[in-house]
A protein has these predicted regions:
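Membrane-core helix-loop-helix motifs of multi-pass transport proteins
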Residues: 165-248, 263
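Alpha-helical scaffold segments in soluble metabolic enzymes
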Residues: 160, 205, 209, 279, ...
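Hydrophobic transmembrane alpha-helices of multi-pass small-molecule transporters
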Residues: 1-95, 212-214, 222-297
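Gly/Ser/Thr-rich helix-start
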Residues: 22, 59, 104, 147, ...
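Alpha-helix capping and helix-loop boundary segments enriched in small/acidic/polar residues
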Residues: 37-41, 59, 88, 106, ...
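Transmembrane alpha-helix interface/packing and boundary motifs in multi-pass membrane proteins
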Residues: 52-61, 137-146, 186-198
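Charged, alpha-helix-enriched surfaces in structured cytosolic catalytic cores
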Residues: 44, 110, 131, 149, ...
């Protein structure tokens, strides 16, 4: 019943947004701009309001809303079609696209899961080490894959380990371990995104803003020189905060579970190996792009 009610609410919100968005744009078309604003700026406000309403209510698919400027900017005589379409070919967009495609390929062939399991098997069985392993694996994957996708991938592995490690522990200790591990996954997914330009969209947006407005070029490697140490430092601090204060569990051994999960993946397929090669080459190209720029140009 609750799900049905939520579904009806979403449909109602979409219908309201579908009507409200164009009305806001129409209001800007029919009214004079307030003091200090040009007519084109006022129409841009109306377009922004339309898009904000449609995005927030999902009146139409979100990607379709993102294409409205291509249609409405020249139609409303705000600017030319060439100016309206130029941002869609911004280098930052292609950086996002490359990162997303790489992340999808890793997820398609389970390369990210293999990396995570290998990391967890390497750190040992102590609870504090397991938390460190989860945080390292999550942060590393989040450097290249979206924070949300990384968290979703790591969560079932974490829950399985929690169930295994707390089986022979006291209830209070088990609960503390569970909370620390789940918080570690959540925090490290966000912290890992700081380390690279493609880790999270605001990073690349900042680089694009600095390039376009201040003529300051921030390369992939330059970002990592600052972002990676900051990310590592934050990971260490978070791990220390989560595991200090007598955090210990009496028993539990997750190695068997992790080895079973790794065995279930089987040997690396040809496609997975190719994705790994592309991943290494892409990461190297992003990092060393300033050194290669003279030869490419």
């Amino acid at each position: 019943m609750a799900e049905s009610s939520q579904g009806r609410g979403a449909v109602l919100a979409a219908w309201i947004g579908l009507i409200l968005g164009p009305l806001l744009l129409l209001a800007c078309i029919l009214t004079d701009p307030p003091g200090g604003l040009s007519e084109k700026a006022w129409l841009t406000v109306g377009l922004a309001a339309l898009m904000a309403v449609w995005w927030s209510t999902e009146a139409i698919p979100i990607p379709a809303t993102s294409l409205l400027p291509i249609l409405l900017i020249p139609l409303l005589d705000i600017d030319t079609l060439a100016k309206a379409t130029a941002p869609y070919a911004n280098p930052t967009i292609f950086l996002f696209l490359g990162g997303f495609l790489l992340g999808l390929a890793m997820q398609r062939w389970n390369l990210h899961k293999r990396i995570a399991l290998a990391t967890l098997l390497a750190v040992g069985n102590q609870p504090s080490r397991q938390i460190a392993g989860f945080m390292i694996a999550t942060a590393f994957i989040s450097m290249w894959v979206s924070n949300t996708a990384t968290s979703i991938m790591m969560l079932p592995i974490g829950l399985s380990v929690i169930g295994l490690l707390i089986a022979g522990s006291e209830e209070k200790e088990g609960a503390r371990f569970a909370v620390a591990l789940l918080l570690g996954i959540a925090y490290s997914a966000s912290v890992g995104g700081i380390a690279t330009l493609i880790g999270t969209p605001p990073n690349a947006l900042l680089a694009a803003f600095m390039r376009e407005n201040y003529d300051v070029q921030i390369g992939f490697g330059q970002w990592m020189l600052l972002g990676l140490p900051l990310s590592v430092g934050m990971l260490i601090f978070i791990w220390w905060s989560l595991t200090r204060g007598g955090f210990r569990l009496a028993g539990g051994d997750s190695r068997g579970l992790l080895e079973k999960e790794m065995a279930a993946l089987g040997p690396m397929s040809r496609a997975e190996k190719m994705v790994a090669v592309v991943f290494v080459l892409a990461a190297a190209a992003w990092i060393f792009q300033p050194l290669l720029a003279d030869y490419i140009d």
